[in-house]
């Protein structure tokens, strides 16, 4: 500040200031402050010339003389005009930016079409499908990388193995005889502790063989036991031997007859015995639903009850499995058909409702009370006693399916 300068400096430079008193009056205050801030006594250039508090007047006098001579070339106020500091410029730019944002857009620029170009409602309504194979990626025993392709291939093979109504041409075999045979095959599977896939495949082999061959009733048990033998070789790690199947038939057939029937079945089916079965789809769909073992077992019970019923033999295995799981979920009050189940099964809930009602009717009114192998099997503690679960009331079932 000019006040901080000593009085000594003022007295030493007083004669020079008196030489041009008129100039001192003409210098504006901004000029003085600018010149004072421009050069300080401590600067290298201000060393030789000691100036007083008004020492800039001499320079101002000189500047006025020069500007008087070169008035047309240089503007007199050019040196006094200074650019605002950087913080002030930034602040002004920020204020101008806010003002420009507050301005309303021109009338000719459409604003609403931008909302129409990106609709929000469809994006919110996209169903979330869970990747159920993500957790098992890299597991060589799970083959998660090919799981979807495998089941898509099985869905394609369903078309090839759809059963016609073959009972019309079987003169010596009835639906009740078939039901008795399947009930006996369930006991064989349980006694030998075979996989469920073995039982389902054996029933499929019997049905497809009877489509092509007209058989007599005295050979029906031989066909069933041989079908279990073939299915065991296809599904089991350690299948039972031929003598075991002769024993369960109470030695009603000879070894040569069993081997001859095995050859006949394989040749009749052209050795194409990889038939899609409901149980494989059921395990897949239960994984999609994150169902517990108890819920899966209830769905197994529902699905296995259909094996001895001829009317369900012509249903698609994937649809039968999906309907059994949906009925089990409804009976347990665990929700309905999720987008993940719809994606992996290929069926929406409305496609399954008629079959679900039929399955619930089957649990409520069993056609033959003498065939209790499946109910006895699933009444055990190992299977959570799911056979004792009370079937749903038909009216309540319809209400839950509609909701």
Curated annotation (Swiss-Prot):
InterPro entries linked to this entry: Cyclin, Cyclin-like_dom, Cyclin-like_sf, Cyclin_A/B-like, Cyclin_C-dom, Cyclin_N, Cyclins_cyclin-box
Keywords: Cell cycle, Cell division, Cyclin, Nucleus, Ubl conjugation
GO cellular component entries: cyclin-dependent protein kinase holoenzyme complex; cytoplasm; nucleus
Transmembrane domains' residue ranges: none
Record localization: Nucleus
Pfam families given in the database record: Cyclin_C (PF02984), Cyclin_N (PF00134)
The keyword Cell cycle is assigned to this record: yes
Residue span of motif D-box: 51-59
Residue ranges, compositional bias (Polar residues): 7-25
CDD domains: CYCLIN_CCNB3_rpt1 (cd20508), CYCLIN_CCNB3_rpt2 (cd20510)
Post-translational changes noted in the entry: Ubiquitinated, leading to its degradation.
GO-annotated molecular function: cyclin-dependent protein serine/threonine kinase regulator activity
Ranges where the record places region Disordered: 1-86, 102-122
Main location: nucleus
PROSITE patterns: CYCLINS
An example Gene Ontology biological process: cell division
Keyword Nucleus: yes
Subunit structure as annotated in this protein's UniProt entry: Interacts with the CDK1 and CDK2 protein kinases.
Family (UniProt): Belongs to the cyclin family. Cyclin AB subfamily.
Domain notes: The N-terminal destruction box (D-box) probably acts as a recognition signal for degradation via the ubiquitin-proteasome pathway.
Protein name: G2/mitotic-specific cyclin-B3
Organism placement in taxonomy: Eukaryota, Metazoa, Chordata, Craniata, Vertebrata
């Amino acid at each position: 500040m000019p006040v901080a300068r000593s009085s000594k400096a003022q007295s030493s430079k007083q004669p020079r200031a008196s030489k041009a008193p008129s100039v001192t009056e003409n210098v504006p205050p901004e000029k003085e402050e600018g010149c004072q801030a421009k050069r300080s006594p401590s600067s290298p250039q201000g060393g030789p010339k000691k100036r007083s508090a008004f020492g800039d007047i001499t320079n101002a006098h000189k500047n006025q003389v020069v500007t008087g001579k070169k008035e047309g070339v240089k503007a007199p106020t050019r040196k006094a005009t200074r650019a605002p500091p950087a913080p002030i410029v930034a602040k002004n730019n920020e204020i101008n930016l806010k003002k420009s944002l507050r301005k309303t857009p021109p009338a000719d620029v459409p604003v609403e079409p931008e909302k129409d170009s990106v609709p929000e409602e469809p994006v919110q309504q996209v169903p979330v499908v869970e990747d159920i194979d993500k957790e098992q990626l890299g597991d060589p025993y799970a083959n998660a990388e090919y799981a979807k392709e495998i089941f898509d291939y099985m869905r394609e093979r369903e078309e090839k193995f759809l059963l016609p109504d073959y009972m019309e041409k079987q003169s010596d075999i009835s639906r009740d005889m078939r039901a008795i045979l399947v009930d006996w095959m369930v006991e064989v599977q349980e006694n030998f502790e075979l996989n469920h896939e073995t039982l389902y495949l054996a029933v499929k082999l019997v049905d497809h063989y009877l489509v092509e061959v007209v058989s007599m009733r005295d050979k029906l048990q031989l066909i069933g036991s041989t079908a279990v033998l073939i299915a065991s070789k296809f599904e089991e790690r350690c299948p039972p031997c031929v003598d075991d199947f002769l024993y369960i038939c109470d030695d009603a057939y000879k070894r040569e007859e069993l081997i001859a029937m095995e050859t006949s079945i394989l040749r009749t089916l052209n050795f194409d015995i990889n038939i899609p079965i409901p149980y494989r789809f059921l395990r897949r769909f239960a994984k999609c639903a994150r169902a517990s073992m108890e819920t899966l077992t209830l769905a197994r019970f529902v699905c296995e009850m259909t094996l001895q019923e001829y009317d369900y033999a012509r249903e698609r295995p994937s649809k039968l499995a999906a309907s059994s799981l949906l009925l089990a979920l409804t009976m347990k009050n665990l929700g309905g058909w999720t987008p993940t189940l719809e994606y992996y099964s290929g069926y929406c809930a409305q496609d399954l409702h008629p079959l679900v009602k039929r399955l619930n009717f089957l649990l409520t009114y069993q056609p033959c009370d003498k065939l209790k192998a499946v109910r006895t099997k699933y009444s055990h503690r190992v299977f959570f006693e799911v056979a004792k679960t009370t079937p749903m009331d038909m009216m309540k079932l319809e209400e839950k399916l509609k909701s």
